[in-house]
């Protein structure tokens, strides 16, 4: 009997990607985050769709429509908080996924890595425009401050900002177009994720050792489908823990105050997952310099394959590089903390030192340490 799974044009694609896919036998739980990101995206699209059914993208009614969702719509509150906290889970998985790629040298798959960096930028853009939609104080002022950064671009900056705003300030036109962007971008993310997977399956997955696993492959199903389901259960457990017990833990209280252009909040800050980049932006006194540093903090990931000087792919057998990697993680946590603090002593100097260290580790120390390790191994 002919197996439809292996012959049907559509089923064949699914089969080759998720069922009969040859996978390395030794990939650890750090390889779970790709599937978790897929689940996060599906969850965000579904909850977002139901929220969009009740949301109105007008400055007069946006805030009250979100209140209406929470108070009057059946299970509206849980949908809203699953969407808001789902974004946080999305970014936790993203950071883990990127960290895994850096640690185990997955960036040597050039196309997969570069599509991944584009995906990271797209997800960040989606989260930013989404944060503006509830039209609270932090939504309004966050949108004003971040879009204003584009005015640092020489010559065309001011015109560009007014073009994005659709006027001379963040107003009705801005909110409407941000809602449109927020609706379309997740589908672009889904398409990019498919391209990401397509390129990954050209080469096959990396593994913790960083060496070829062609000699020892196992089918993706049932081994890794079961493993992914366990990861998904953990993800849903932690998400629901957040949603049901501390839904506002990661949010800003200022966003429960309707947007008011005449009243600036004492501390304007983005959501927690952008704080590291925000701290780097604030650590440079010059506006254009700050914007360049902000963009570079993510764009530097594109350079990772060029900065790889080690003869080994993975950090698994490179203790000095491992130490440096964990210093980088600690540095990013420090930047995240600083991004949420007011601009005053000693936070300014800590932020500046942490920002310098961030670029120093990636651009200078990593390649040097890798070369030293090569010499120690007599390669």
Swiss-Prot record:
A ubiquinone binds at residue 201. InterPro entries: Cyt_b/b6_C (IPR005798), Cyt_b/b6_C_sf (IPR036150), Cyt_b/b6_N (IPR005797), Cytb/b6-like_sf (IPR027387), Cytochrome_b (IPR030689), Cytochrome_b_C_euk/bac (IPR048260), Cytochrome_b_N_euk/bac (IPR048259), Di-haem_cyt_TM (IPR016174). Binds 2 heme b groups non-covalently. CDD domains: cytochrome_b_C, Cytochrome_b_N. Its cofactor is heme b. Heme b b562 binds at residues 83, 182. It is found in: Mitochondrion inner membrane. One of its GO terms (molecular function) is metal ion binding. GO terms for cellular component: mitochondrial inner membrane; respiratory chain complex III. It holds the Pfam family Cytochrom_B_C. It is a multi-pass membrane protein. Heme b b566 binds at residues 97, 196. GO terms for biological process: mitochondrial electron transport, ubiquinol to cytochrome c. Heme 1 (or BL or b562) is low-potential and absorbs at about 562 nm, and heme 2 (or BH or b566) is high-potential and absorbs at about 566 nm. The cytochrome bc1 complex contains 11 subunits: 3 respiratory subunits (MT-CYB, CYC1 and UQCRFS1), 2 core proteins (UQCRC1 and UQCRC2) and 6 low-molecular weight proteins (UQCRH/QCR6, UQCRB/QCR7, UQCRQ/QCR8, UQCR10/QCR9, UQCR11/QCR10 and a cleavage product of UQCRFS1). This cytochrome bc1 complex then forms a dimer. PANTHER family: CYTOCHROME B (PTHR19271:SF16). Belongs to the cytochrome b family. This is Cytochrome b. The gene is MT-CYB.
